[in-house]
């Protein structure tokens, strides 16, 4: 209904980091850098940190940050960090929106998924993974009966259906779509299909 725009970034700049700084494991505080601006010590190039990949949770050998460069540095010719720090990955991003899924209007928040960590020629189907769950009064106090103007913990109300939409990727050969809504298809780094139009007559 209010579709979040889907975008494909085939220049998702990656920077590998040393795992420690002055003997401290940087993964302990690395999450705090998301959204912050960092500057190369030698190149003086600045970039905004967008995403982080860790060997413990992602298919990478080294701690890697993904950045958007802001300037070209002191010499006005360099556009990426120096000293072999720079690599190129690929990603897909979805903006805030509302989708009509299984008879319900479901809100989706801005999400970014890394397609290939160190390659910009990915081949994937990108879309929304649909997950259904039930939320009861044990999970949300507001579901207790409040007919008298206050929460009555002795009278739990009805459970609620929760639908969660998560941006995910699937191989081109994976055609199992029971809980998947495709919105973007990429083959060898080329966009082959993109779903961007809202079809109100189907609602």
Segments from the language model and where they lie:
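Subunit-assembly interface segments of extracellular/virion macromolecular structures
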Residues: 1-203
């Amino acid at each position: 209904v209010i579709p979040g725009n889907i975008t494909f970034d085939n220049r998702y700049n990656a920077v590998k980091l040393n795992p420690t700084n002055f003997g401290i494991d940087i993964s302990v505080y690395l999450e705090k850098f998301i959204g912050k601006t960092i500057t190369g010590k030698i190149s003086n190039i600045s970039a905004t940190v967008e995403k982080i990949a860790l060997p413990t949770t992602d298919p990478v050998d080294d701690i890697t940050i993904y950045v958007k460069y802001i300037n070209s540095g002191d010499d006005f010719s360099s556009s990426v960090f120096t000293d072999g720090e720079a690599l190129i990955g690929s990603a897909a991003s979805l903006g805030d929106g509302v989708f009509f899924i299984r008879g319900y209007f479901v809100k989706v928040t801005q999400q970014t998924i890394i397609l290939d960590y160190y390659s910009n020629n990915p081949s994937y189907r990108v879309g929304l993974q649909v997950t259904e769950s039930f939320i009861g009064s044990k999970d949300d106090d507001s579901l207790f009966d409040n007919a008298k103007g206050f929460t009555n913990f002795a009278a739990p109300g009805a459970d609620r259906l929760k639908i969660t939409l998560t941006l995910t990727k699937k191989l081109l050969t994976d055609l199992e779509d029971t809980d998947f809504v495709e919105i973007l298809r990429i083959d060898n780094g080329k966009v082959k299909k993109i779903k961007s139009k809202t079809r109100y007559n189907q609602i």
